[in-house]
């Protein structure tokens, strides 16, 4: 203000673009990997502006959709949410759409760590378009190498712009934080 520069906050302004990115990635999986999306369960971690649109995309593609959003569940008390453990057990694709919180009761920093990946039951595809630090890079790379997940679609990277090139060369789709 002192410098005469105006600014504004525009939460959710890119949510449609992120939803289009995820939809395109899902369709690319279907085309190149031969998966039938309508037979899969999509788990959405973080159901705000972006996650809500992803839920709609999943439903339009005929997918079963499970949603996880602990802050919203605590605030709204909705029974429409599933636990992270339920998503780990039931989902074929897990997509992250959470803000980055390094501390607190809703901490998302390294939410997907070695323990998380070892809890997965269905060898899912992992999608991250939220914040790079939500997924621990070494844990993701180990999960790929150990067959705990079948593939990864990554648009946001831990330590951007100095990303892990081994991980970049291992993912199904890697993009530069579009």
Where in the sequence are the language-model features?
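Rossmann-like adenosine-cofactor binding region
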Residues: 73-165
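Short, acidic/turn-prone active-site loops that include or flank metal/cofactor-
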Residues: 11-15, 71, 87, 156-158, ...
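Glycine-rich NAD(P)-binding loop of Rossmann-like domains
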Residues: 25-62
